[in-house]
């Protein structure tokens, strides 16, 4: 079993992200050839939050995924378990509410948010189903979940090339651009170990989310899952 199996130690994963925090965003841009910015924009579009609504961004890291909500004047809370990542985010965007916390035990009351999102972070959670259930708990009735995560390419030949890139090229590139290249070996292994689009959709439904759907990005390199909490979202006065 690889170190990136679903049986993870949260303290070890958090420490790993502490190490990569200073160069995290730059390295991600390099490794994705600039695609991470586009994927994050699509997450914001899928959330579709409007002024007056409150958004929880789980596994927000340095806050790059939270910035568009803050820039739009929304009330966004950026939560992460890596103090190193939060430190970088707070220094860059002091206007965003950064909170240290565990995705499997969210420090919020029931029905606190109009939408909850997690971008490229669910793989790093020790108990992803428990985290999905916690996100459901803190979402208001009628509220929305959006999950962006690396997934499984749908075209066979591309899947083969992608696997080769993950296990060989990605760690080599990270060795030149990251402060902790071994973290990107973990990244490659965790992507390979992650369930495919349909299985993740089933996980989301299993914990109680409704109307689960997903959209493939870049041929399934990334999948954008969306779901709703049963009930009706109250309109703001």
From Swiss-Prot:
Gene Ontology biological process: menaquinone biosynthetic process; methylation
Catalysed reactions listed for this entry: a 2-demethylmenaquinol + S-adenosyl-L-methionine = a menaquinol + S-adenosyl-L-homocysteine + H(+)
Keywords per UniProt: Menaquinone biosynthesis, Methyltransferase, S-adenosyl-L-methionine, Transferase
Gene Ontology terms for molecular function: demethylmenaquinone methyltransferase activity
Gene3D superfamilies: Vaccinia Virus protein VP39
InterPro entries to which the protein is assigned, alphabetical: SAM-dependent_MTases_sf, UbiE/COQ5_MeTrFase, UbiE/COQ5_MeTrFase_CS
Listed transmembrane segments: none
SUPFAM superfamilies listed in its UniProt record: S-adenosyl-L-methionine-dependent methyltransferases (SSF53335)
Top EC group: transferase
EC number of this enzyme: 2.1.1.163
Binding site for S-adenosyl-L-methionine: 62, 80, 102-103, 119
Pathway terms, separated by semicolons: Quinol/quinone metabolism; menaquinone biosynthesis; menaquinol from 1,4-dihydroxy-2-naphthoate: step 2/2
Pfam families assigned: Ubie_methyltran
Purpose of the protein: Methyltransferase required for the conversion of demethylmenaquinol (DMKH2) to menaquinol (MKH2).
Family: Belongs to the class I-like SAM-binding methyltransferase superfamily. MenG/UbiE family.
Database matches in PANTHER family: 2-METHOXY-6-POLYPRENYL-1,4-BENZOQUINOL METHYLASE, MITOCHONDRIAL, METHYLTRANSFERASE
NCBIfam families: MenG_MenH_UbiE (TIGR01934), PRK00216.1-2 (NF001241)
Name assigned to this protein: Demethylmenaquinone methyltransferase
Organism this protein belongs to: Renibacterium salmoninarum (strain ATCC 33209 / DSM 20767 / JCM 11484 / NBRC 15589 / NCIMB 2235)
